[in-house]
């Protein structure tokens, strides 16, 4: 019998949601991302996907995800092809299944950023190639690889740290943080109004993983309880893409703004405390949105104050850069025929 030397526990797998991966697998991808970042900084080529063609499907617009997948593909020696909302017809003029079969016959891998998690799952099922979820309404796994890579880069470890998310506890980033932290043994606190707590289904998924990893999960509307002992304070926009209920959210979430008072509530020494945000952030009035919010609601900052955003705690731009390195690791591991027989 001929031995297959292309042993790889990731080869051919799609990355649709964090819950599909073990703690060891996620940590491997995070560490691989740190390794590829070091290679990039040292100018050492790593063309693991030479000759591959990558489809980048975007129903939702993007700055960081598109840029990260494009540069990651090129660094790996692959050719990325962008297909925007005017180029793809998922479920409109062509079924998602039919689109998957066509793209799978032409491309070696597919990134999908859109609304429905079911579309990502159909693409993965019917394309025959790895599909990477660049964001859906439910989950944001590529953001999580970058986020926990950033945490490990700053603290040298993951297990036993505490991350507090403040804001809309039902959005995809909060869902993914809760579940990924639970898998990795990171304590996750969600601080939000009761009406915006994560769904019971999401909480149950996270609790199942936390029982194995020892992660402590806290979901509360009390800032003091949620922030105490935190190493990472994390927030996201108050209104997600596709939503329009600004007035309601501003009223609900203003008490959950990340400001210096919130950072102090952690009681954590400065050298053990960072702030993170997946971006874009409404921290001043330098944008059209920022100006409109000021005119309508009389506030100049939303989910985070400019003071925190520009402070010594801020790591959001490292986090944004790490999107590229972590996505590169994920793509190479799942498509590059690398030798990864176990993790």
From Swiss-Prot:
Pathway: Amino-acid degradation; L-arginine degradation via ADI pathway; carbamoyl phosphate from L-arginine: step 2/2. GO terms for cellular component: cytoplasm. One of its GO terms (molecular function) is amino acid binding. Ni(2+) ion bind each monomer of the trimer. SUPFAM superfamilies: Aspartate/ornithine carbamoyltransferase. The keyword rRNA-binding does not apply. L-ornithine binds at residues 172, 236, 240-241. It is an enzyme of class 2 (transferase). Ni(2+) binds at residue 79. GO terms for biological process: arginine biosynthetic process via ornithine; arginine catabolic process to ornithine; citrulline biosynthetic process. Involved in the catabolism of arginine. Catalyzes the phosphorolysis of citrulline, the reverse reaction of the biosynthetic one, yielding ornithine and carbamoyl phosphate which serve to generate ATP from ADP. Carbamoyl phosphate binds at residues 62-65, 89, 113, 140-143, 278-279, 323. The C-terminal end of the protein is critical for the stabilization of this oligomer. This is Ornithine carbamoyltransferase, catabolic. Keywords: Arginine metabolism, Cytoplasm, Metal-binding, Nickel, Transferase. Its EC number is 2.1.3.3. It is found in: Cytoplasm. Homohexamer; dimer of trimers. Gene3D superfamilies: Aspartate/ornithine carbamoyltransferase.
